[in-house]
Regions:
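Helix N-cap/capping motif at the beta->alpha junctions
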Residues: 36-45, 66-68
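Active-site beta3 strand of CheY-like receiver
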Residues: 50-56
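Non-catalytic signal-transmission and effector/linker regions of two-component phosphorelay proteins
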Residues: 1-10, 115-130
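Conserved acidic carboxylate
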Residues: 13
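Alpha4 helix (beta4-alpha4-beta5 surface) of REC/receiver domains from two-component response regulators
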Residues: 23, 68, 91-108, 119-123
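Receiver (REC) domain active-site loop signature in two-component systems and cognate sites
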Residues: 61
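Two-component/phosphorelay signaling modules centered on CheY-like receiver
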Residues: 16-35
Length: 130
């Protein structure tokens, strides 16, 4: 990924208020193109046309949860190597260790600070870009 920049963020979140705060924070902080999906199924349906540089993924969603969504994204050629970051209120050390062991690049606790979300996402992406 040498020379690649962070331009496109996919955020999968079922809560409308959280989606909008995150969208605003990311667009404001980095002028990123942010695509929002309400479910794992929706995310899987758009990754063929929207090629994200990083994926932010809620863990607890109805239907396909974040873990199942990550597993499905990893099986797709377009997203097999894209860093996936879980955003969740479940941040006990055992849970975080489990998410990382299953392949998450990082975990951002909810509630998150909108003022620092963009910088946090960029930092995580840079750690995994090289």
């Amino acid at each position: 990924m040498a020379g690649k920049t962070l331009d496109r963020v996919l955020y999968v979140e079922d809560e409308p208020d959280i989606r909008e705060v995150a969208r605003f924070a990311l667009e404001y902080s980095g002028d990123y193109e942010v695509k929002i999906c309400e479910s794992g199924a929706e995310a899987l349906s758009i990754v063929g046309t929207f090629k994200p540089d990083i994926i932010l993924l809620d863990v607890m969603m109805p239907g396909m949860d974040g873990l199942a969504t990550m597993e499905a994204l990893r099986q797709r050629e377009e997203t097999a190597d894209v860093p996936i970051v879980f955003m969740t209120a479940k941040v006990q050390s055992a849970e975080v260790s489990r998410y990382l062991a299953l392949g998450a690049a990082s975990v951002i606790p909810k509630p998150f600070d909108p003022r620092t979300l963009g910088a946090t996402v960029k930092e995580i992406w840079e750690e995994h870009a090289g």
